[in-house]
């Protein structure tokens, strides 16, 4: 099965594009959703998080307090490394098991992994057969995140500064979706890539 890594900067529209591919029959594994799963109440990462950061890292319902942890790791690279050392192996384990289940079921023409930090992680570039980048201008990113999350412009810029640059993402892309235009243009691009991915997967092509 052809496996594609979908990535893009914050506010680029990764989730929307992934949903459009899912509607066309693609299998989707979203690593952000897996991260939420393991840090939900009773999640696999919770005991290790409490041991590393104390009970103050949890919300009253027992889930990881994402806002509190975001503030901690933003200011402390060592804390960021500790958090990733807990969550990343669990996410990789879940990703591998879900992918095996999808391949075994044989119900989807191809598999898309949604990985916000695909370029930054490095390992993902060796795992997937193709890289699909959802791209838009930085001004569009900023406007979308300010509207969606209620962040200030400075907060959005600080997040973007921690991510790969637009040029770095585009440099590793096999395919690019321009998400600066109207929904009709986005739909046409998804339709074209869906046809391409189906054809490649049917032909047994797993690498770009």
UniProtKB/Swiss-Prot annotation:
Chief localisation class: cytoplasm
Entry's transmembrane regions: none
Binding locations of ATP: 11-16
Disulfide pairings: none
InterPro entries: Depp_CoAkinase (IPR001977), P-loop_NTPase (IPR027417)
A GO molecular-function descriptor: dephospho-CoA kinase activity
Enzymatic class: transferase
Pathway as given in its UniProt record: Cofactor biosynthesis; coenzyme A biosynthesis; CoA from (R)-pantothenate: step 5/5
Residues covered by the DPCK domain: 3-208
Domain of life: Bacteria
GO BP terms in the entry: coenzyme A biosynthetic process
Any one cellular-component term (Gene Ontology): cytoplasm
Reactions this protein catalyses: 3'-dephospho-CoA + ATP = ADP + CoA + H(+)
EC number(s) given by UniProt: 2.7.1.24
Localization terms from the record: Cytoplasm
Alphabetical UniProt keywords: ATP-binding, Coenzyme A biosynthesis, Cytoplasm, Kinase, Nucleotide-binding, Transferase
Signal peptide: none
Entry's family note: Belongs to the CoaE family.
UniProt function note: Catalyzes the phosphorylation of the 3'-hydroxyl group of dephosphocoenzyme A to form coenzyme A.
Protein name, entry field: Dephospho-CoA kinase
Species annotation: Cupriavidus pinatubonensis (strain JMP 134 / LMG 1197)
